[in-house]
Amino acid sequence: MAFSRLSFAASLIVFSSLIISSVAYYGNEADPETGKLIPIAVEGIIKCKSGGKTYPIQGATARIACVKVDAYGNELVPISILSSKTDAKGYFIATIFPSQLRAGRTVTKCKTYLYKSPLADCDFPTDVNKGVRGQPLSTYRILQDKSFKLYWAGPFFYTSEPTYY
C-alpha cells in the first residue's frame, strides 16, 4: 500500500513537471555573464514528397508564431515572423530578438508552421511533423558563444497532391 502511494506521488511530480515545461517561456533566459536576454532561433528543413521521391525545396519559407506575455504573465497579441528562404538543402532559420519585443515582455507557446513553397508542382502543405497545425518548440541548445537558444523544427513536407485532414 505504501509503495503504491509512493509511486502515485512520484508519478504526480513527474507529470506536473511535464506540464510546467510544456508552457515554457522562450527568449527570456538571460546570459549569466552579461545579464542580457538571449534571442531564440529556429532552424529546420522543408522538403517535397512527390510519389516515392523526397527532395529539399529551395526558396520555401516557414512561419513561427508565438504569444507575447507581459511582465505580469498576461498573454497579449501574438507575434509572427517568417524564416529566411530555404537554401538548396531545404534548410531555413528564423530568429526572434528581445529587441523585437517591448521591455518586460517575453514570448511563449511558440509553434512553427509551413508557410510557402515556390514550387507549383509541390505546393500542398502536409501535416507531417505538424507542419499545418504547428509544431511546438520544445528542446533547444544554447550555442557555444551564448548568442542564441537554438530550436529545431521539422522536417516539414509539401506534396504535389492535396491532403485533407
Swiss-Prot record:
The gene is SRPP. It comes from the Eukaryota. Disruption phenotype: No visible phenotype under normal conditions. Short and abnormally shaped root hairs due to the suppression of cell growth and cell death, and withered seeds, both having a tendency to necrotize and thick cell walls with abnormal structure in phosphate (Pi) deficient conditions or after ethylene treatment. Production of dark brown shrunken seeds unable to germinate, especially in low humidity. Root hair and seed specific expression. Also observed in other tissues including siliques, roots and flowers. Its main location: secreted. Coiled coil: none annotated. It holds the Pfam family Pollen_Ole_e_1. Contributes to cell wall structure in root hairs and seeds, especially in phosphate (Pi) deprivation conditions or in the presence of ethylene. Particularly important in maternal tissues (pericarps and seed coats) during seed development, especially under stress conditions. Confers thermotolerance in seed germination rate. It is found in: Secreted, Cell wall. Induction: Accumulates in root hairs within five days under phosphate (Pi) deficient conditions (at protein level). This is Protein SEED AND ROOT HAIR PROTECTIVE PROTEIN. Disulfide bonds: none annotated. Residues 1-24 form the signal peptide. GO terms for biological process: cellular response to phosphate starvation; ethylene-activated signaling pathway; heat acclimation; plant-type cell wall biogenesis; response to ethylene; response to low humidity; root hair cell development; seed development. GO terms for cellular component: extracellular region; plant-type cell wall. Keywords: Cell wall, Developmental protein, Ethylene signaling pathway, Secreted, Signal, Stress response. Belongs to the plant proline-rich protein superfamily. The keyword Isomerase does not apply.
